[in-house]
Amino acid sequence: MKEAIDLYFDENYGKLYEKIENGKANIFEYVDENGKITNQFLIREIPEKVEGNTFYDLVTPYGYGGPVIHYSNNKEKLLENYENAFTKYCKENNFVSEFVRFHPIIKNYEDFSKMYNAQYMRKTLITKLDEEEPEVNQFGKSCRKNIRQAMNKGVSYRVTENPDSIGSFKEIYYSTMDRNNATDYYYFDDDYFNDILKYYKNNLILIEATFEDKVIAAGLYFTYKDIIHIHLSGTLNEYLYLSPAYILRYAVSVWGKENGYKLIHHGGGRSNSEEDSLYLFKKNFAKLYDTDFYIGKKIWNEELYNKLCEIKNVDPSESFFPAYRKI
């Protein structure tokens, strides 16, 4: 299998989210004399029918993605031809609209901003591992203090590369979701974790924080080329006072540096606010570097989009996208 530009563009990545998003993963590939573009998405059935016919919309799988240029010698012409080809493809397959979460590191929104009406959402955070002592120079002062105190109290960690099992991680993760009153979407089931091991065992690291021989926090991280992607983590309720979540981020930074990775992508907050608590937590480990996260909205069949909005009695210009899924 040919290596993708990044994890989120890998051909198996979308398969992880078919069940969760109730969709079917697919990749559209466009190649001509001007270059190559691929676009990975999930195809979701729209519940409402129009004149007895079934229609679909497209969405980027969990995380980031969207259309991406692999190479080009005439970018303007390539983009024009891609748009024409993709419009035809959507019409032939009853695809009405597409919602894209562009990749903040690859920055593919720069090439597709006009086509998808790209909209800035928020900052996402980065630790650069190819610089000197990232855990000293890029971690916040209070963060470094929390790490020292946790270690002095006896918290340590272990790193498992390419883990065979992640059963213990799941228990800790679910307990954290319970504590945070998370929506059902984030309660990934056994099939999801089995698929992660099936497709990405060799791109996975499991880090566990331990205290008195007990695993008290754990994190699951993807590695791809020279990037580490923070994925899922959790802490047992009764050990929150030891701040083991800080140890996990410290550990992934140390391990990543030792193993030649260039950066850690922490993602952003739950909202677009710079006072968002998750964003502020992540900023502890990335005080120097960030990047921009954009979304894209594209109506591929205006007539059908408007008909669906009419059926649902919503305004097509509604900011929620696609508008017909609002209610």
Residue map of PLM features:
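A short, internal acetyl-CoA/4′-phosphopantetheine-binding micro-motif in the GNAT/acyltransferase core
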Residues: 65-75, 130-131, 233-242, 270
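Active-site/acyl-donor-binding loops of N-acyltransferases
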Residues: 42-47, 113-134, 262-327
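Aromatic (often tryptophan-rich) hydrophobic motifs at membrane interfaces
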Residues: 84, 193-194, 198-307
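A gly/proline- and charged-residue-enriched helix-loop-helix capping module
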Residues: 59-104
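Short, high-confidence coil segments that cap the C-terminus of an alpha-helix
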Residues: 23-25, 92-95, 259-261
